[in-house]
Structure formats: structure tokens, C-alpha cells
Amino acid sequence: NSLISDKTALSAAPADTDEFLISDAGTLKRIDYSLIKATNTPMILAVSNTSQTVSDSTTTKVTSLNTQPINTGGTWDSSNHRWTPGVAGTYFLAGQTSININNAGSYLQAMVYKNGSVISYNQVTAEGTNATYISQACIIDTADTDDYYELYIRHNTGGNSTINYDTAYKYTNFFGYKLT
């Protein structure tokens, strides 16, 4: 006769204090769900929601990331446009930039900075003209409690360019979350 049936099945995620039985070399032990569940916080998604002009051949901080649809733990500094996780750990971080490029051979770069220095970089080169281009940079990085991260952009289109933004499609964005 089984103690487990469809009448005892969980219909939602377990509570942190729910317990599981495990076998440790043949000895049954209890463990709370809170000790084994995945937690990817702190986490951030910052999205560009306004126009920002970027000068030709100039590395520029993206300061138009004014919407944070996800911001759990950590600190988004809207005056400095940077994220401080606030919890030591290993993080996945990524940034995406988008502009229109009118000249074949021009490039667009996305860069993730840590504490004022670039740690991840990606470049796309335009193959055609009059098209929207997106560059994405990502990295797994170890942070302490006061490290901070920022998104930068650079292009060489021959003149000023405006960052593409749309809060629905999130053309230009920065995100990060704790892995361990």
C-alpha cells in the first residue's frame, strides 16, 4: 500500500519549510526545500525607454536604461545607470545595444563594464546599408558585495547615431542574475 497518491501531490511549488527524504549512504534524512531550491537572485533587467545620442567613435555609457521590469535584490542606481548586486557570488551578465547603420563596413559594439573597466565586448560589422544592427556582450563573472556593472556602446557610422529603444522589444537592455 503506497502512502503517495494523486491526493497528496503538490499543485504548487513547495514551501521553504517543506521537507524531502533523501538517502545518505542508506540512512534516511530530511532536508528542507529552502536548502535545495534554485535561487537566481539578485537579478536585474534594465531596458532603454528613451532616446540617447551616441557620438561617432566614442565609447559611451548607455544612460537610457530607465525602465527595470525585473529588479529583485541588488541596487539599480538610476543616477549612475549601473547595477550593484550587493551579494557576493557568480553572475551571468549581458548587455545589448542597437542602432541603425547606413554604411556597409561600419561597426557597432556592446561592452559590459565592471567597476569602470570593460570585461566583455562584442562587435558586429554592417554588411549592408540602411539596416538595424544589434550587438550583444555577455560574461560569467565573480562579484563581491560592492562590485558594479554598466553597459557601454560604441560605433563608427560616420556621425551621431541614436540608440534604438522599445520597451516591448527591448532592443537596448542590460541584465544579470546570480548563478551561485
Spans of features found by a protein language model:
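Short polybasic amphipathic segments
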Residues: E19-F20, A110
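Extracellular jelly-roll beta-sandwich "head" domains, especially the C-terminal globular C1q domain
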Residues: A38-T180
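Generic detector of short, aliphatic-rich beta-strand segments that form the cores of beta-sheets
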Residues: N1, D32-Y33, F174-G176
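Extracellular/surface-exposed low-complexity repeats and stalk/linker segments enriched in Gly/Pro
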Residues: N1-A13
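Short, surface-exposed terminal/edge motifs of secreted or surface/virion proteins that either
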Residues: I22-T39
